[in-house]
Curated annotation (Swiss-Prot):
One of its GO terms (cellular component) is ribonucleoprotein complex. PROSITE patterns: RIBOSOMAL_L5. Keywords: Ribonucleoprotein, Ribosomal protein, RNA-binding, rRNA-binding, tRNA-binding. Coiled coil: none annotated. This is Large ribosomal subunit protein uL5. GO terms for molecular function: rRNA binding; structural constituent of ribosome; tRNA binding. Part of the 50S ribosomal subunit; part of the 5S rRNA/L5/L18/L25 subcomplex. Contacts the 5S rRNA and the P site tRNA. Forms a bridge to the 30S subunit in the 70S ribosome. HAMAP family: Ribosomal_uL5_B. It holds the Pfam family Ribosomal_L5. The keyword NADP does not apply. It comes from Bacillus velezensis (strain DSM 23117 / BGSC 10A6 / LMG 26770 / FZB42) (Bacillus amyloliquefaciens subsp. plantarum). Belongs to the universal ribosomal protein uL5 family. The gene is rplE.
Length: 179
């Protein structure tokens, strides 16, 4: 079993139960899924850009991402409906815990001038969004093979009812929030 999942079951869940006075274990918020999205705006001109983004996301997440396509045409961006414009991957279960563990303990500390992540990125429903400016912070990405530095969005979806509950859950898991 993953060490983060073990920690959740043994320490975090009972701590949250006492803090928020839940009656049942099923009320305790837990992490449902993690969605990693990488927008590839230059895929409009360069078709190979989407392939490199898909390859990088596969290395980072450990599973093959889905190519996202444009919903409508936008003339200003020279974009047609159905053109590939990004890639996303949804992690659940064991892979989700592995990725979160790697993100907290290895990748985030590698960010330049890292002082913690923002406390304000909650959406009001207990989900947290984290923007990453470069994919090079992940150990799986080989610096020499990177054609272009790309950022990505990481959304952590929880079953929490409020931002306060979700913040407490993520703090207990070990997310390095700003003081």
């Amino acid at each position: 079993m993953n060490r983060l999942k073990e920690k959740y079951n043994k320490e975090i869940s009972p701590a949250l139960m006492t803090k928020f006075n839940y009656d049942s274990v099923m009320q305790v918020p837990k992490i449902e899924k993690i969605v990693i999205n990488m927008g590839v705006g230059d895929a409009v001109q360069n078709a190979k850009a989407i392939d490199s983004a898909v390859e990088e996301l596969t290395f980072i997440a450990g599973q093959k991402p889905v190519v996202t396509r444009a919903k409508k045409s936008i003339a200003g961006f020279r974009l047609r409906e159905g053109m590939p414009i990004g890639a996303k991957v949804t992690l659940r279960g064991e892979r989700m815990y592995d990725f979160l563990d790697k993100l907290i303990s290895v990748s985030l500390p590698r960010v330049r001038d890292f002082r913690g992540i923002s406390k304000k990125s909650f959406d009001g429903r207990g989900n947290y969004t984290l923007g990453i400016k470069e994919q090079l912070i992940f150990p799986e990405i080989d610096y020499d093979k990177v054609t272009k530095v790309r950022g990505m969005d990481i959304v952590i979806v929880t079953t929490a009812n409020s931002d306060e509950e979700a913040r407490e859950l993520l703090t207990q898991v070990g997310m390095p929030f700003q003081k």
